[in-house]
Curated annotation (Swiss-Prot):
One of its GO terms (cellular component) is cytosolic large ribosomal subunit. Keywords: Repressor, Ribonucleoprotein, Ribosomal protein, RNA-binding, rRNA-binding, Translation regulation, tRNA-binding. It comes from Paracidovorax citrulli (strain AAC00-1) (Acidovorax citrulli). The keyword Cell wall biogenesis/degradation does not apply. This is Large ribosomal subunit protein uL1. The keyword Cell inner membrane does not apply. Binds directly to 23S rRNA. The L1 stalk is quite mobile in the ribosome, and is involved in E site tRNA release. Belongs to the universal ribosomal protein uL1 family. The gene is rplA. GO terms for molecular function: rRNA binding; structural constituent of ribosome; tRNA binding.
Amino acid sequence: MAKLTKKQKALQGKVDSTKLYAFADAVVLVKEAATAKFDESIDVAVQLGIDAKKSDQVVRGAVVLPNGTGKTTRVAVFAQGAKAEEAKAAGADVVGMDDLAAQVKAGDMPFDVVIAAPDAMRVVGTLGQILGPRGLMPNPKVGTVTPDVATAVKNAKAGQVQFRVDKAGIIHSTIGRRSFDNDKLQGNLVALIEALNKAKPATSKGLYLRKVAVSSTMGVGVRVDTQSISA
C-alpha cells in the first residue's frame, strides 16, 4: 500500500468517517487529497440493498455520462459488411472478424471496449476465456452486442461506463477526473444513480441506495449524503 503524504494524512484527519457529507463538500475534500502529479480519476462506490448471491438481484448495465470520463476510449468492433463500415464511420479504432480474433488470441488488445454485431458472436464466442477475465466480453445487457454498432461505438467514445455489482453488493465506477468542475462531476453522478435506480431488481427489498462514497485514485474516501445528489 502506498504511503500517505503529509497533506493526505492531514486531510484524512479532517474527514469524519461517521459523517455524511453533501456531495459538493465531499468533492472539495477529495480534490484536496488528490495530490498525485497526474489527473486522478474521481470514483464512486455505491452500496446497494441487494443480495448479490441471488442471480435475480445482480445489477448490471451501462450509462453514458453526460460530461464524459476524461479518458480516451479505444473501441474494437467485430462486424462485417455494412456493419463494419458503419462502425468505422462512427469512429471505431479497430474493426474486423477472424483477423481481429487472431489479434486477440495473440494478446494484442490495445482497446478498452469490445462491441459485436449479433452475427459476429460465432467468432467472439470462441474468445470468452481471453476477453471475459479482462471485462471485455461483449454482452447485450450493457449494449455491446447490438445490430446498431454505430450507436454503440459513439456511446463508448462519448463516455459510457459499464457497471456490475460485486460480491459485496457494491458498484464501482468513475465519474470523471480531478480537473472536472464540481457541476460536471455531480451531473455524471446523477446519471449513474438514475441508471442504478432503473436497474433495481424487482426482488430487492428495503433501502436500495444504502451508502455512497467518493474518492480519488490515490486519495481518501468520503461518504456522501444521497439526499445531496441532484442535478
